[in-house]
Amino acid sequence: MATLEDKLQELLQPSVEDLGCELWGIECQRSGRFFTVRLYIDKKDGGVTVDDCADVSRQVSAVLDVEDPIADKYNLEVSSPGLNRPLFTLKQFENYIGQDISVHLRVPMFDRRKWQGKLEKIENDMLTLIVDNQPQVLVFGNIQKANVVPKFN
């Protein structure tokens, strides 16, 4: 069964692409009575501007008003993924092999939900992280949330 994020991705991706942006990912989050739909957009040149975010927000709002896929009232947020960009797809993970990432698992592995390490490789739907000089193999489907850990020199 498709998640709300999957449905929104399919519905909104063409509109975002029409504006010259890539729909990097979507997060839906409930906090009490409040519901937030967070869209991350990117551009090939990496230069997402405030105007890009405003344009996408207007376009996406119009689509959501017409299609009405969200039953509750919601707040829409549009931003770039930023330095500690969230990772949503295996293809996105592949772009960050050799870099540090942080992962939150749905189901704990070795009594841990939070892992951080260097992404060494991806085979099928298995990601290998080097954590404390030891390889840890994580199943992509068990990843609840992941992001790049930025390096500051």
Curated annotation (Swiss-Prot):
User: Is Cytoplasm among the key words of this record?
Assistant: yes
Where it sits in the cell: the answer is: Cytoplasm
User: Which keywords does this Swiss-Prot/TrEMBL entry list?
Assistant: Cytoplasm, Ribosome biogenesis
Q: Which Gene3D superfamilies match?
A: Ribosome maturation factor RimP, C-terminal domain, RimP-like superfamily, N-terminal
GO cellular component term, pick one: cytosol
The record's annotation in Pfam families points to: DUF150_C (PF17384), RimP_N (PF02576)
Q: Read off the InterPro entries from this record.
A: Ribosome_maturation_RimP, RimP_C, RimP_C_sf, RimP_N, RimP_N_sf
In terms of domain of life, where is this protein from?
A: Bacteria
Coiled-coil regions in this chain?
A: none
What biological-process GO terms show up in the record?
A: ribosomal small subunit assembly; translation
What protein family does this chain belong to? Belongs to the RimP family.
What this chain does, per the entry, is described as: Required for maturation of 30S ribosomal subunits.
Stated name of the protein: Ribosome maturation factor RimP
